[in-house]
């Protein structure tokens, strides 16, 4: 498995798929301020558990 980038929308409680469009997942304008775009690099597990957040 290769590493890959994954971009999602998050509000700290939920994660929604980012479809490539810069549109917030909520249509309600007051809720749009709560969503942030986040990008992560997903890497295969190498068995080295020394890295911790």
Curated annotation (Swiss-Prot):
GO terms for biological process: symbiont-mediated suppression of host innate immune response. Keywords: Host-virus interaction, Inhibition of host innate immune response by virus, Viral immunoevasion. Transmembrane segments: none annotated. Disruption phenotype: Knockout of this gene prevents the phage to overcome the host Hachiman defense. It comes from the Viruses. The keyword Chaperone does not apply. Counteracts the host Hachiman antiviral defense system. Homodimer. This is Hachiman anti-defense 1.
């Amino acid at each position: 498995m290769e590493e890959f980038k994954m971009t999602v929308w998050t509000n700290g409680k939920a994660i929604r798929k980012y479809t490539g469009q810069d549109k917030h997942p909520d249509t309600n304008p007051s809720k749009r301020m709560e969503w942030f775009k986040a990008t992560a690099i997903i890497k295969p597990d190498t068995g080295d558990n020394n890295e911790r957040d």
